[in-house]
Amino acid sequence: MSTKVKKCREPARVTLPAPEEEDGEAEGAEPQRRRRGWRGVNGGLEPPCPRAPPSPGPDASSEGSPSRWRTAGMRDKGRRQAVRGPAFMFGARGPSLTAEEERFLDAAEYGNIPVVRKMLEESRTLNVNCVDYMGQNALQLAVGNEHLEVTELLLKKENLARIGDALLLAISKGYVRIVEAILGHPGFAASRRLTLSPCEQELRDDDFYAYDEDGTRFSPDITPIILAAHCHKYEVVHLLLLKGARIERPHDYFCRCADCAEKQRLDAFSHSRSRINAYKGLASPAYLSLSSEDPVLTALELSNELAKLANIEKEFKNDYRKLSMQCKDFVVGVLDLCRDSEEVEAILNGDLESVEPLERHGHKASLSRVKLAIKYEVKKFVAHPNCQQQLLTIWYENLSGLREQTIAIKCLVVLVVALGLPFLAIGYWIAPCSRLGKILRSPFMKFVAHAASFIIFLGLLVFNASDRFEGITTLPNITVIDYPKQIFRVKTTQFTWTEMLIMVWVLGMMWSECKELWLEGPREYIVQLWNVLDFGMLSIFIAAFTARFLAFLQATKAQQYVDSHVQESDLSEVTLPPEVQYFTYARDKWLPSDPQIISEGLYAIAVVLSFSRIAYILPANESFGPLQISLGRTVKDIFKFMVLFIMVFLAFMIGMFILYSYYLGAKVNPAFTTVEESFKTLFWSIFGLSEVTSVVLKYDHKFIENIGYVLYGIYNVTMVVVLLNMLIAMINSSYQEIEDDSDVEWKFARSKLWLSYFDDGKTLPPPFSLVPSPKSFVYFIMRITNFSKCRRRRLQKDLELGMGNSKSRLNLFTQSNSRVFESHSFNSILNQPTRYQQIMKRLIKRYVLKAQVDKENDEVNEGELKEIKQDISSLRYELLEDKSQATEELAILIHKLSEKLNPSALRCE
């Protein structure tokens, strides 16, 4: 086979049957035409081997000239080999192209501006919408190779199709100038041209987008602005936003509207993919930066929405999590670009000027964005140095100099506050607006006061049990009374002074929790697990004291009966009614449901929960904070593990009980003979405290005994070797995750603790918070007054807006809002932007510039080299065209000159 035939097949990159030998000896004329013009022969494809060209004569066209062959050979070795070469997977349905169309597509692909211009101007039979076997027309080929001049020439044709496809291609490659040229086409003047997806426009429109049944380069639901957002093309997104393009946020996942139901019914997968594509566009930093008036708030809310979708749509969990993290990184990136405290405060507080004065009155630093970031667990944003520095400044507010003091000085301050807490509370009640009041209202002092109050509460709990540290003097079967007619239960149910103080503290803490529940709302209150722990602890305390009080009331009634009906001095000689006699019994004869017994059990649980609440203040310390976080994560792992543990435990507990339930009294020990004994044996065997003889029978029933040995052995292997080691591995993994990012985790937990003391209120800790201060009454009256004033102002404004002389102002405001909707760009969001909007505009400019610089630094040189090659290719064709024109002009001049010099010779001829 000849070399030329191999060269002919090589660009097509398909495997073809070997042609006849005489075909291989042919030399290729018009190689480009043969390379493109494939025809079906006998149901197959005709191999792209050129037939022997006709011998060039004096009248041969330029297409058959050797220079034409060389040009075609160079193109065969060019950068787009086999682009239009067919392959069997595309079938034989591709349209046949004429020589003119072949030449036109070649010129558009390689940037031959003179040829394209000439054919568009002179040719009458040229089909500008002709496509190659891949379905690409001349406009797409020109756009794909970044030939701006060719694109502009093609866009001047009135009947040009698939302009939308070319726009998507230009956006994907980042050709901004070509995008501008295409957007200037009259076809984009139609309403909603940029907002509808190609699939929707194909159903209601012409061939602005042309999608075949085999699919194309882009998904049918991709709009130009979605694609630009996916590719992070800031300039393109800006252009499209100016044209009115927007990304519509998908409906809620559980939406049951007619549109969503129809899409879900037709193709659930396509519906899900279209939602992901839309969210990818919405979560793009380019779209967030340029489309939103408040990008930080938009990104925070979108990150939370995407995190929820990750838990709902499990099949696309990783995609949604990645997008959620992308939104969080955007917020952190904007915060990182702050250069002064004003910019940091703007991001952390949000637009305070848009908040009502009544809501803004409380504290100058609302920290609304920080609260939102904590709620949505944007940990890197909260732990960022810029945010932490601002929070630390607020933490030591009104305490100048304490921030720079040593730990010893701070500990001394804590001790002084703890010892002088009652006096500080009295001083605050008397003069809440004095210097002392301002100091006590600082977040640090509020934290110290509450911590000191809680430590005093724990001290009371310990002191209440101190009389029993070395044991009790009265045995459970002995009753001790103060005087002969006294009922024993009256003595045991009386409240001591320490218990009364504990009750006062509990009431104070419950009052604080109720106020917090009222201010935050039930939903926000329950989300914080510490609130659930506090409420549960206090509820158990109240239940314990209530049961104790009921027992005291019953004993008091019995004592009243004795005092009024019994005349004897010794109750042991008197027959009392059963309901009264019961209260004279010793502890060993009390019923299990006795209120005092229930009270003591609940009180013990509440004490345990009270001491566990110390972990709430541990994040304030850098050493103990990460440990507390690891402990919390470990508890979560244990709860997850308990599901599998309980399943295995119940299986073996019931199985062993069924096996040995018939052998009660016939075993070495009572293990597994009852459900209770089965539970005890299996539970303590986890810690190695159960004996192997638990399965041994006194009878010679070896089969049952052997089954017991096997089941007991399998249980120990499963629980001890497998499940417990799995739990240890889970705990180790969780601890390692915290340790790897301990600084961020600790700062996030510390910020949550700090933030609970930043808001106004909670100045005095329990139980001092039970007594309302004069300031509370003043603030209550001020709030009522401000509320009535604001309501009067709103009514007055409504009346003014309803009058005819204010219609012009209303129209101006409406026009301003419409301009805001049409251009979310760098220019001006409002005619008179607020200070917050000015700062956000400045930060977004920095972010966009930084993103563009980073992209330029990350770009590979291959793209630049390709662009240079394409420019050189276009320049080559222009130079060749200029050379051809110069040659023709020179030939004409020579001919005219020869006519003048040799007129006689020409006449003779």
UniProtKB/Swiss-Prot annotation:
Pfam families: Ank_2, Ion_trans, TRP_2. Ca(2+) 3 binds at E859, E862, E864. PROSITE patterns: ANK_REP_REGION. Ca(2+) 2 binds at E513, E516, N531. Activated by diacylglycerol (DAG) in a membrane-delimited fashion, independently of protein kinase C. Activated by inositol 1,4,5-triphosphate receptors (ITPR) with bound IP3. May be activated by internal calcium store depletion. Inhibited by intracellular Ca(2+). Its main location: membrane. Homotetramer. Interacts with ITPR1, ITPR3, MX1 and RNF24. Interacts with JPH2; the interaction is involved in maintaining Ca(2+) homeostasis in skeletal muscle and is mediated by JPH2 'Ser-165' phosphorylation. This is Short transient receptor potential channel 3. It comes from Rattus norvegicus. The gene is Trpc3.
